[in-house]
Design a protein with these regions (language model features):
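Interhelical loop/hinge segments that connect adjacent transmembrane helices in multipass membrane
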Residues: 1-16, 126, 188-197, 206-248
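Interfacial/gating helices of multi-pass transporter permease domains
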Residues: 11, 37-60, 122-128, 190-191, ...
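Residue-level signature of transmembrane alpha-helical cores of multipass secondary-active transporters
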Residues: 15-23, 56-57, 95, 134, ...
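Alpha-helical transmembrane segments and their helix-entry boundary regions
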Residues: 46-49, 65, 157-163, 193-194, ...
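Membrane-interface helix-capping segments at transmembrane helix termini in multi-pass transporters
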Residues: 47, 81-89, 105-133
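Small-residue-rich hydrophobic transmembrane alpha-helices
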Residues: 47-100, 144-153, 268-317
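Alpha-helical transmembrane segments of multi-pass membrane proteins
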Residues: 108, 121-147, 275-279, 318
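Membrane-interface helix-loop junctions in multi-pass transport and translocation proteins
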Residues: 169-205, 318
Length: 318
C-alpha cells in the first residue's frame, strides 16, 4: 500500500485534472455539432459526417507517428534554446509538409476512396466535398497540435488550458453561424463543420506562433536550419506509426467499411462520438499525462507506473 501511495503522490494529479477539463472542451463542441446536424432537414447529415470517421483513421496513423515522439524530442531540447528553436521551426515544416502531401492525396482520390469504403452512392458527392474541406482543416489542426506541444515543453501549461477553452468558445460561435438552423446562420450544413475547423485552427495557430516568437523561439537568425534530429525522430515515429497503421487499417476494413455496407454510418458516428468523447475521456487523458511526464523525466516510468495502473483500475471500476 505504501508503494501505491508513494507512486500516486509522484503523479501530477492536478495536471491530470486539468487534462480532463481540456478533454471535456472538444467533447462539448462535438456534442453541440451532433445537435446542430440533428436539426437539419433530410436524413443524410449524420451519414455524410460519419464518412470522416475512416478518413480520420488515416490521419491518426500520421499523427501518432509525428505528435507522440514530439513530446520526447521537444522535452529533451528545452534546456538548449537554440536547439529547441531549431526543432520547433523544422518540426513545423516537416509535420505541415507531411500532412499537406497526405491531404492532397485524399483530396485527389476522395471519390474512389468513398466507393471503396462502400459509401452510399446517394451521398458520395456531398461526402467528397465535406472530406476535402476537412482535409484542409487537418493541416491547420496538426500545426495547432504541434505548437501546443511546444507550449507544454516550455512550461506554459496554463496557456494550453486557455487556448483549449478559447477553441471551445470559437467553435461554438462559428458552428452557430455556419451550421445551425437559426435565422442568422449561413446554413452550410455538414460542410460548415469543416469551415469552422479551418477558421478556428488557423486563428489559434497564428496566435500561438506569435507568442512563441515573443518568447524568442521563432526569431529570424543567421543560423541554418538543421534537420539532423529528424533521423532519430523518424526512427521512433516509424515504430509508433507502423503499430497505428496495422491497427487502423484493420479497423477501417473490418468495421468502418462494414458500417457503410449496412448503411448505418450516421448511427455509428453518433455512438462513436459518445463513446470516445464521454466514456473513454479519463483513460485518454491519462495517456496524455503519461506522455507529458515521461517525456520530461525518464525516471517517471519507474516511479509512477504503479500509480498509473491504480488510476486506470479506479477508472475501470467506475
Amino acid at each position: 500500500m505504501n508503494k501505491i501511495k508513494n507512486s500516486l503522490q509522484s503523479v501530477n494529479l492536478k495536471f491530470f485534472a486539468a487534462l480532463l477539463v481540456m478533454g471535456l472542451c472538444p467533447t462539448i463542441y462535438t456534442t453541440l455539432r451532433v445537435f446542430f446536424l440533428g436539426q437539419l432537414p433530410g436524413d443524410w447529415a449524420y451519414s455524410i459526417a460519419g464518412q470522416l470517421s475512416w478518413v480520420n483513421l488515416i490521419y491518426e496513423i500520421i499523427s501518432e507517428a509525428i505528435i507522440l515522439p514530439l513530446f520526447f524530442f521537444m522535452g529533451s531540447a528545452i534546456l538548449n534554446k537554440d536547439d529547441f528553436s531549431n526543432k520547433l521551426k523544422t518540426g513545423l515544416i516537416v509535420s505541415g509538409g507531411i500532412y499537406t502531401i497526405l491531404s492532397i492525396g485524399i483530396i485527389l482520390f476522395t471519390e474512389p476512396l468513398l466507393t471503396f469504403m462502400a459509401a452510399s452512392p446517394d451521398i458520395i458527392k456531398e461526402s467528397a466535398t465535406y472530406i476535402r474541406i476537412e482535409s484542409v482543416a487537418n493541416v491547420a489542426g496538426v500545426l495547432l497540435n504541434f505548437v501546443l506541444v511546444a507550449l507544454i515543453a516550455i512550461g506554459r501549461d496554463k496557456l494550453v488550458y486557455v487556448f483549449t477553452v478559447l477553441k471551445l468558445a470559437f467553435c461554438v460561435v462559428t458552428d452557430t453561424f455556419l451550421i445551425s438552423t437559426l435565422p442568422f446562420s449561413l446554413n452550410l450544413g455538414v460542410n460548415g463543420i469543416g469551415y469552422s475547423n479551418i477558421i478556428v485552427n488557423t486563428i489559434l495557430t497564428i496566435v500561438i506562433l506569435m507568442i512563441l516568437s515573443k518568447e524568442g523561439y521563432l526569431v529570424r537568425d543567421k543560423q541554418k536550419l538543421s534537420f539532423a534530429w529528424c533521423k532519430d525522430f523518424f526512427k521512433i515515429g516509424s515504430v509508433s506509426g507502423l503499430e497505428s497503421f496495422v491497427r487502423n487499417i484493420a479497423y477501417m476494413l473490418m468495421v468502418s467499411r462494414m458500417v457503410n455496407v449496412v448503411g448505418e454510418s450516421g448511427v455509428y458516428w453518433v455512438a462513436n462520438n459518445f463513446i470516445w468523447g464521454w466514456m473513454l475521456l479519463p483513460v485518454l487523458q491519462l495517456g496524455e499525462l503519461i506522455k507529458q511526464e515521461v517525456s520530461t523525466d525518464k525516471n517517471k516510468v519507474k516511479t509512477n507506473t504503479l500509480g498509473y495502473f491504480t488510476i486506470t483500475t479506479f477508472i475501470c471500476i467506475l
